[in-house]
């Protein structure tokens, strides 16, 4: 192998390691058997949620994971691998890929990492079942509003009953 080729691969390892360090969520999949159309739709869905999706050689992924300080990926980096990196939403890549895998049987989740901790296929699928950040915030807001709403209804009912008594 030429020195230029080795230097390019070293740069690629460094770039992937930086992506792994910066990512809050990483999902590794085997996308063998996806049609071009399915792959295009999957990539579009991921891009809309600010998730980067790349097909990367396992040897580069192993070296990058080692450089990023992530251990336990050896079982995950077997066979063809595509990786989804998210720097913002922990749930987005898992949810999009899991939902897509229900329709496209060729797509198989292998595992990943959540906030720097290596995760199994089952943990990624469990993460996918959670609502996204906006959904969780709206649930929290509705829980916080419920007592205030109940007090408002009680005050309104008391006011209406006093109006009826006065009339």
UniProtKB/Swiss-Prot annotation:
UniProt GO molecular function: large ribosomal subunit rRNA binding; structural constituent of ribosome
Taxonomy, superkingdom: Bacteria
CDD domains, per the entry: Ribosomal_L10
Gene Ontology biological process: translation
GO CC annotations on file: large ribosomal subunit
Protein keywords: Ribonucleoprotein, Ribosomal protein, RNA-binding, rRNA-binding
SUPFAM superfamilies: Ribosomal protein L10-like
Pfam families linked: Ribosomal_L10 (PF00466)
InterPro entries: Ribosomal_uL10, Ribosomal_uL10-like_sf, Ribosomal_uL10_bac, Ribosomal_uL10_bac_type, Ribosomal_uL10_CS_bac
Protein purpose: Forms part of the ribosomal stalk, playing a central role in the interaction of the ribosome with GTP-bound translation factors.
Subunit structure: Part of the ribosomal stalk of the 50S ribosomal subunit. The N-terminus interacts with L11 and the large rRNA to form the base of the stalk. The C-terminus forms an elongated spine to which L12 dimers bind in a sequential fashion forming a multimeric L10(L12)X complex.
Family according to the record: Belongs to the universal ribosomal protein uL10 family.
Protein name in UniProt: Large ribosomal subunit protein uL10
Organism: Streptococcus mutans serotype c (strain ATCC 700610 / UA159)
């Amino acid at each position: 192998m030429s020195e230029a080729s080795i230097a390019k691969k070293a740069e690629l390892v460094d770039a992937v390691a930086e992506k792994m360090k910066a990512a809050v969520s990483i999902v590794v999949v085997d996308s063998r058997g996806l049609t071009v159309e399915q792959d295009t739709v999957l990539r579009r869905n991921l891009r809309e949620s600010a998730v980067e999706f790349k097909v990367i050689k396992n040897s580069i992924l192993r070296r990058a994971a080692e450089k990023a300080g992530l251990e336990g990926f050896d079982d995950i980096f077997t066979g063809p691998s595509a990786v989804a990196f998210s720097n913002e939403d922990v749930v987005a890549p898992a949810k999009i890929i899991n939902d897509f895998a229900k329709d496209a049987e060729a797509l198989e989740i292998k595992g990943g990492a959540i906030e720097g901790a290596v995760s199994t296929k089952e943990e990624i699928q469990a993460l996918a079942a959670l609502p996204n950040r906006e959904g969780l915030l709206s649930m929290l807001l509705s829980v916080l509003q419920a007592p205030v709403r109940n007090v408002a209804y009680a005050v309104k009912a008391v006011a209406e009953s006093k109006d009826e008594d006065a009339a």
